[in-house]
């Protein structure tokens, strides 16, 4: 009964009864779980060598991985160098004097606290109080704080060290390959090829080729199957794995500089368990899947060492642009993708991603598996046009159409300096809950500089995969300069009441493509991770793009303190200046919870006494406060030209001095938009003039 069910003709995979068969018999009869019942002899290409185009694609992937590895090592090196400089510049002994600044501690000196990690004495200025579950406060010195930051930003906190990795060896390419006319019949016998060497235990040298190695390195049963389709080693890992594992190249020197890792990860039990778990999660190398090489007169083992059904499943980049018999075919197929796609990155947010929505899931992996492939490379039919290999590897292409689609519209109101984002609906979202549904919501960020200050979100809709929001989220204070350099990231997430919210998918749109005062509608398939297109970088892989984006976001967070919308009007009826504080946007977070308690202070200089100073109300726990308050200064119009208005934004704190967020100064001595705003106010009486001003980290007012 069991045999009848499993060997049904309608089943795609056939498993006969294996009770009377031994393991060797299964290999000879081509039976087992991995044997396809039809078309097996034509699809099996173990004796065919990889083409030069395929080898070039593999070499480009390896070069990208090495590039990312070098960038990761440089990034960690900068972190370590900064930490070492802090350690070298200590001025105290950590007992009677502060370990950092060297200030005297004790009864006659500053207050003393003990660092929780290094157990050294520091003053309260050089120590940082951290929150913990313990009832008493926990203090850390700035060196230990920096050490924890390095441990966190390098990813070593997860692995308790750095895992090792060995990159695949570059594939040798034979340039003087003889050509055969397509019209002549070619025998189907496989051509003999020189076996490929097995990967060494150390990292391979970039320039090593098959010709430079001796014949003694080409022995072993696994080496005879090198001309097979999948014999070039384990599949290349995704860029997200490469970013984590590439940091382990200099793990020994990093551990010595930090004193936090427990030696070589491969020598400790935890390191062995970690290495086993990492290797178990990856596909096994093709050379290990075939224990014996196939003989010319004997069919290959049922396991098949080919990594994909056809050439387009693994390498969708090799789309022939000329005839295969043309002498320039190799160069045309391997030309840089800048010439084919129009730039690094290769696609726009509104263009190609919409085209991808038309492809069914797994279209380019199953289409080539349906038809048998000829054995001879020169007579092979060109594969159907597919996407670039680098573009397909930049994100999870197999889930490009399974995450769902999002419909939204964008409108830039240039007169009011606002960006209106209308989230209409989503369709076919990926189920995230156990009931096969989701609780989706949409959140928006502006890149670079993503933070809570520019985060907007919709309401959450329960138990649906096809939500309809019809919500409009508005970004205020968006100038023409912001439209040229900002990118809008739209993320769809699943809300979880009892845990962390789960990410479903996202899409990004460069705001410089949006025309002012013209609404643009979008219906785009969600992607798991979308790389940013950056000019001047070769091989914009996902890991490199995210790393560059992380660097830009950190720079943006440091430079931008926020913006303030101010209105000025000189009233001839009241005989004075009316200053309106309308709102602030994208303020810097000053509190530990990631928010601020902002208020605005005004000071008309030179000093006119107490009547020259005004202050708004305090807005609690927000980075985008709305004040809508007006203040009146009784001053003659002729005297106003000699004055300057100082505007400062502060974070209110209880029990200590307020934190300065940023400010700006309007007056004759100002420059740019500030001077223009003040001049228009003096020129146009009884007319309210509103302007956005960038806050600067220049404090002109005391915190009292």
UniProtKB/Swiss-Prot annotation:
Residues 1-52, 167-398 are annotated as: Disordered. Its cofactor is Ca(2+). Ca(2+) 3 binds at residues 549, 591, 597, 651-653. The keyword Zinc-finger applies. The keyword Metal-binding applies. Residues 279-290, 366-380 have a biased composition (Low complexity). It is a peripheral membrane protein. Residues 291-310 have a biased composition (Pro residues). One of its GO terms (molecular function) is calcium-dependent phospholipid binding. Zn(2+) 1 binds at residues 98, 101, 123, 126. Residues 44-161 form the RabBD domain. The modification Omega-N-methylarginine is found at residue 229. Residues 402-524, 560-693 form the C2 domain. Specifically expressed in brain. The modification Phosphoserine is found at residues 277, 702-703. Zn(2+) 2 binds at residues 115, 118, 141, 144. A zinc finger (FYVE-type) spans 92-149. One of its GO terms (biological process) is calcium-dependent activation of synaptic vesicle fusion. It comes from the Eukaryota. Ca(2+) 4 binds at residues 591, 651, 653, 659. Residues 205-214 have a biased composition (Basic and acidic residues). Ubiquitinated. Deubiquitinated by CAND1 to prevent its degradation. Keywords: Calcium, Cell membrane, Cell projection, Cytoplasmic vesicle, Lipid-binding, Membrane, Metal-binding, Methylation, Phosphoprotein, Postsynaptic cell membrane, Protein transport, Repeat, Synapse, Transport, Ubl conjugation, Zinc, Zinc-finger. Binds calcium via the C2 domains. The calcium-bound C2 domains mediate interactions with phospholipid bilayers. Plays an essential role in docking and fusion steps of regulated exocytosis. At the presynaptic level, RPH3A is recruited by RAB3A to the synaptic vesicle membrane in a GTP-dependent manner where it modulates synaptic vesicle trafficking and calcium-triggered neurotransmitter release. In the post-synaptic compartment, forms a ternary complex with GRIN2A and DLG4 and regulates NMDA receptor stability. Also plays a role in the exocytosis of arginine vasopressin hormone. This is Rabphilin-3A. It comes from Bos taurus. The gene is RPH3A.
């Amino acid at each position: 009964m069991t045999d009848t069910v499993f060997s049904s003709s309608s089943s795609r995979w056939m498993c006969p009864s294996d009770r009377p068969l031994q393991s060797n018999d299964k290999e000879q009869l081509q039976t087992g779980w991995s044997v396809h019942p039809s078309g097996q002899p034509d699809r099996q290409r173990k004796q065919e060598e990889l083409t030069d185009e395929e080898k070039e694609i593999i070499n480009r992937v390896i070069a990208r991985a090495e590039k990312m590895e070098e960038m990761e090592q440089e990034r960690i090196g900068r972190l370590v160098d900064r930490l070492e400089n802090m350690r070298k510049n200590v001025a105290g002994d950590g007992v009677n004097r502060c370990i950092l600044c060297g200030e005297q501690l004790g009864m006659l000196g500053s207050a003393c606290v003990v660092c929780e990690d290094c157990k050294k004495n520091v003053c309260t200025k050089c120590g940082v109080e951290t929150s913990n579950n313990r009832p008493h406060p926990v203090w850390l010195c700035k060196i230990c704080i920096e050490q924890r930051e390095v441990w966190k930003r390098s990813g070593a906190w997860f692995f308790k060290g750095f895992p090792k990795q060995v990159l695949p060896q570059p594939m040798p390419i034979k340039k003087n390959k003889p050509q055969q006319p397509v019209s002549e019949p070619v025998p189907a016998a496989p051509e003999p090829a020189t076996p490929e060497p097995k990967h060494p235990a150390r990292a391979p040298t970039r320039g090593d080729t098959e010709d430079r190695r001796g014949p003694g390195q080409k022995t072993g049963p696994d080496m005879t199957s090198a001309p097979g389709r999948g014999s070039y080693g384990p599949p290349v890992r995704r860029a997200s794995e490469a970013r984590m594992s590439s940091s382990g190249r200099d793990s020994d020197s990093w551990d010595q500089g930090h004193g936090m890792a427990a030696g070589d990860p491969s020598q400790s039990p935890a390191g062995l368990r970690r290495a086993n778990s990492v290797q178990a999660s990856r596909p096994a190398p093709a050379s290990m899947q075939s224990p014996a090489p196939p003989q010319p007169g004997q069919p290959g083992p049922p396991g098949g060492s080919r990594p994909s059904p056809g050439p387009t499943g693994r390498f969708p980049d090799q789309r022939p642009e000329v005839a295969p018999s043309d002498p320039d075919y190799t160069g045309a197929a391997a030309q840089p993708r800048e010439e084919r796609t129009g730039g690094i990155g290769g696609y726009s947010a509104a263009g190609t991603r919409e085209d991808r929505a038309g492809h069914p899931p797994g279209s380019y992996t199953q289409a080539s598996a349906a038809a048998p492939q000829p054995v001879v490379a020169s007579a092979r039919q060109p594969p159907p046009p597919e996407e670039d290999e680098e573009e397909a590897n930049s994100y999870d292409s197999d889930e490009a159409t399974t995450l769902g689609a999002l419909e939204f519209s964008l409108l830039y109101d240039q007169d009011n300096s606002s960006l209106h984002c209308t989230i209409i609906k989503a369709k076919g979202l990926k189920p995230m809950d156990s009931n096969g549904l989701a609780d989706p919501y949409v959140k928006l960020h502006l890149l670079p500089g993503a933070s809570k200050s520019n985060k907007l979100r919709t309401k959450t809709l329960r138990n649906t995969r096809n939500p309809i929001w019809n919500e409009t989220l508005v970004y205020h204070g968006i100038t023409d300069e912001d439209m040229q350099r900002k990118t809008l990231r739209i993320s769809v997430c699943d809300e979880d009441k009892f845990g962390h919210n789960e990410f479903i998918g996202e899409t990004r749109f460069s705001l410089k493509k949006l025309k002012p005062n013209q609404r643009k509608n979008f219906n785009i398939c969600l992607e798991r991770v979308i790389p940013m297109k950056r000019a001047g970088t070769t091989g914009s892989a996902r890991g490199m793009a995210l790393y560059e984006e992380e660097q830009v976001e950190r720079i943006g967070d440091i430079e931008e303190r926020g913006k303030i919308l101010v209105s000025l009007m000189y009233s001839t009826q009241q005989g004075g200046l009316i200053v309106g504080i309308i709102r602030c946007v994208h303020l810097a977070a000053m509190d530990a919870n990631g928010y601020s308690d902002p208020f605005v202070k005004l000071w008309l200089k030179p000093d006119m006494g107490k009547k020259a100073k005004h202050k708004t109300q305090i807005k609690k726990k927000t980075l985008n406060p709305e004040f809508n308050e007006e203040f009146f200064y009784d001053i003659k119009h002729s005297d106003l030209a000699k004055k300057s208005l100082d505007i400062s934004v502060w974070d209110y704190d209880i029990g200590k001095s307020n934190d300065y967020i940023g400010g700006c100064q309007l007056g004759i001595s100002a420059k740019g938009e500030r001077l223009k705003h003040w001049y228009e106010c003096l020129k146009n009486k009884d007319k309210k003039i509103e302007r956005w001003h960038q806050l600067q980290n220049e404090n002109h007012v005391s915190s009292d």
